[in-house]
């Protein structure tokens, strides 16, 4: 079994990349995550409307923290208000262990997978653990 992320991408059942525009409502982001049973969405620039023009990431954890602080009314706010702007990424050539170490070091559960400047996937901690 290969140890790099590329092999994981090739063996995935599907590799749709789920993203939302930064001016979308948090409620809309929650619906996309729920419908697709995912824990994070990449956030792209609303001006270009290009999912490759990444600006951040929003996770279930971001939503929970928002609701605990401001209540469910805050779900009408825009995604850009809670997204993390620092997108941490790996390349397809990165090993699974390096990716897991990066997640643990940064206390995150999702990594963007970038091949040069192109987004090719999103890797979750669950994806990695399934491979152990």
Roles of regions detected by a PLM:
Residues 1-132:
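Tandem CBS (Cystathionine beta-synthase) repeat/Bateman regulatory domains
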């Amino acid at each position: 079994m290969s140890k790099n992320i590329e092999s994981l991408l090739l063996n995935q059942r599907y590799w749709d990349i789920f993203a939302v525009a930064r001016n979308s409502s948090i409620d809309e982001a929650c619906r996309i995550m729920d419908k697709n049973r995912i824990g994070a969405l990449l956030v792209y620039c609303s001006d270009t409307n290009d999912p490759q023009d990444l600006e951040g990431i929003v996770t279930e954890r971001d939503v929970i923290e928002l609701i605990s602080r401001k209540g469910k009314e805050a779900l009408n706010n825009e995604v850009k208000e809670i997204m993390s702007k620092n997108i941490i990424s790996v390349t397809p050539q990165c090993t699974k262990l390096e990716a897991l170490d990066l997640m643990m070091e940064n206390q995150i559960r999702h990594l963007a997978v970038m091949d040069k400047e192109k987004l090719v996937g999103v890797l979750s901690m669950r994806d990695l653990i399934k491979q152990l």
